Amino acid sequence: MVNFTVDQMRSLMDKVTNVRNMSVIAHVDHGKSTLTDSLVQRAGIISAAKAGEARFTDTRKDEQERGITIKSTAISLYSEMGDDDVKEIKQKTEGNSFLINLIDSPGHVDFSSEVTAALRVTDGALVVVDCVEGVCVQTETVLRQALGERIKPVVVINKVDRALLELQVTKEDLYQSFARTVESVNVVIATYTDKTIGDNQVYPEQGTVAFGSGLHGWAFTVRQFATRYSKKFGVDRIKMMERLWGDSYFNPKTKKWTNKDKDAAGKPLERAFNMFVLDPIFRLFAAIMNFKKDEIPVLLEKLEINLKREEKELEGKALLKVVMRKFLPAADALLEMIVLHLPSPVTAQAYRAETLYEGPSDDQFCIGIRECDPKAELMVYISKMVPTSDKGRFYAFGRVFSGTVKSGQKVRIQGPNYVPGKKEDLFIKAVQRTVLMMGRTVEPIDDVPAGNILGIVGIDQFLLKSGTLTTNEAAHNMKVMKFSVSPVVQVAVEVKNANDLPKLVEGLKRLSKSDPCVLTYISESGEHIVAGTGELHLEICLQDLQDDHAGVPLKISPPVVTYRETVTNESSMTALSKSQNKHNRIYLKAQPIDEELSLAIEEGKVHPRDDFKARARIMADEYGWDVTDARKIWCFGPDGTGANLVVDQSKAVQYLHEIKDSVVAGFQLATKEGPILGENMRSVRVNILDVTLHADAIHRGGGQVIPTMKRVTYAAFLLAEPAIQEPIFLVEIQCPENAIGGIYSVLNKKRGQVISEEQRPGTPLFTVKAYLPVNESFGFTGELRQATAGQAFPQMVFDHWANMNGNPLDPASKVGEIVLAARKRQGMKENVPGYEEYYDKL
């Protein structure tokens, strides 16, 4: 137990080589918060008695009631290492004290945006995997997010006590199950190898995998056992570590190591991992759980475990917990793994700088980030807002990448749309206070140097969700975070009492600040819309809105799904529209964009800010575009980043460059609200075939061109066999075999399609993966539990957009009904207008 003072923390912060910023990530219910507890307890914040039950990082009331983590919370830990351990660290360090900033993040799919925010400010990740369930869909999603941010993973295989007590497996089975889990983690990592970081895969024999039980508070790495045996037998620890995993066997008769599983006489030998690592653990479990009073003291003496008087009287699980905690304390194994194998900010920022910084990679700011220099110009990235205890205000939560933040310092607050040299999205204000985040409390601190995580008071009014703080006007922003989920479910919110309206508006502002992935806006019909990533996410957001942010009773509409509008063919004829004054004409055709390219644009692989020649090259090589077309992309839409394109295919048009901005603006308007549902368009490419313009500049201004472009886009769109795309969830369901029938019947009823069904080796569980339209997903969990007597647990994550069958213009079809309902809800005319409305004859 360590008692911190802020001054001690501050002196540690200056030795940046000894700081570790890491997040804990995992699938829901694999035990992140419980594991985090055993770490926090070591740093002296909760007492030993409560660990495993306190879930210290679940700070909110609803988190404690539901037993899930919703927001990510930060905590600082302190750790000291022995001299011979410090020697093994492959990066520069000073002294033996380490400061670990740990962020516990949620595992539930709906909150993966919280995880993204946590990952941006950390350099390493502790990936927790349940040893019975293995690598699940969310483990993969989060791991991918981490690797995309160039974050180094280490793995903990948790809930080993379940395997021992519930499934009663043999040692070899357990070893095989560990090996399989490690392999499936490495498969995900291998698909994301990055040459700058080197090999990121995890290996038990190198000490980058720990095994343990968060609930019982014990864990071990192969390295710890190697240390024990190397002292006992006097062999080299590094050699011992390699022997304790994989196919190496020890023959006790000849005292020799072999890699064959039989000795000379053909008798089977026991694997070294089973013999030296698992055997003592299995023996302890067997002796204690079978109440063998005479064996226990002998074992404890051999393992050098000393119990206090009152602890000797315990039995069963209680005794097991105490003994295992003394034998293999979880914090030791995890802290050792974190300190030895995760990078310090100095190491990590050297290779993360170019993925973090938007500007040129050779300017002084990027160099400051790369060197993590506390004396360079200030660069702070704010990744999210954390509500303070008095509800009204927020702490800005983020990380100093270069320079030093001081209380009272004047900073430039740059929002995500800021461009150097312009005044948009920029405020210059003083930082009121800087604080350290410690789970449920905050500690004031004078200044924070580069490489550390902090909270800032007094700038919350100027930032929406995330942004960059700098002191120099030449500095570019840090890159915006890419969220792996998109808000696809929305509800309309009204107040029950009209006088409360201003409070609702204020509450919505606060809500969109506090959650990185919620959208709030006012629709055309004047409703207040809140959009979230799924049912649970929305439920939590609305609860927050009602209780904290607005504090007034609300009326909430049933949830509605957002759609996308697209085309399935090329326009059947060239669309033409004339401007209001009849002097300008635009000729267009629309055609669909391949799904591959749309995804690449949405994931940011093809980016509007890329160099156009480089982008043309990629589009020609990978997506089969014509190079001349690819070079003449005028813009992406909507919002300048969506998956719709304008391509200029016109030849020798006079004054064309003058109306380019107006055409782009018209296209942004058209793609933001399509003609069918008023939703965003997706995967629509518009080719400008010809433009006729008036000779006088005054007759071809924005007021003439913008509405014309919007109309002609609609006309071309409606001529190209329009279709509606709906969002699809990927559902992963874990269940025993007898529940599979129930799952299929519920999925069939909900238009779901099963894509795979497999049994997890060594367990009675099956994993069913299926696609389920978001529209049908409301109440899915409840129905599924009814059909399977509560044995099936679904996990849903947004996967892709899929075209709906049927003609959206025909009110009799299923799609037509959706269109009709949506148009009624938004107060439009009931029938979709024909193309004639937007098409002008010559």
From Swiss-Prot:
Keywords: Cytoplasm, Elongation factor, GTP-binding, Hydrolase, Nucleotide-binding, Protein biosynthesis. GTP binds at residues 26-33, 158-161, 213-215. Residues 17-253 form the tr-type G domain. It catalyses: GTP + H2O = GDP + phosphate + H(+). The modification Diphthamide is found at residue 699. Its EC number is 3.6.5.-. Pfam families: EFG_C, EFG_III, EFG_IV, GTP_EFTU, GTP_EFTU_D2. SUPFAM superfamilies: EF-G C-terminal domain-like, P-loop containing nucleoside triphosphate hydrolases, Ribosomal protein S5 domain 2-like, Translation proteins. One of its GO terms (cellular component) is cytosol. One of its GO terms (molecular function) is GTP binding. Signal peptide: none annotated. It is found in: Cytoplasm. It comes from the Eukaryota. The keyword Nucleotide-binding applies. SMART domains: EFG_C, EFG_IV. Belongs to the TRAFAC class translation factor GTPase superfamily. Classic translation factor GTPase family. EF-G/EF-2 subfamily. Catalyzes the GTP-dependent ribosomal translocation step during translation elongation. During this step, the ribosome changes from the pre-translocational (PRE) to the post-translocational (POST) state as the newly formed A-site-bound peptidyl-tRNA and P-site-bound deacylated tRNA move to the P and E sites, respectively. Catalyzes the coordinated movement of the two tRNA molecules, the mRNA and conformational changes in the ribosome. NCBIfam families: small_GTP. This is Elongation factor 2. It comes from Komagataella pastoris. The lineage of its organism: Eukaryota, Fungi, Dikarya, Ascomycota, Saccharomycotina.
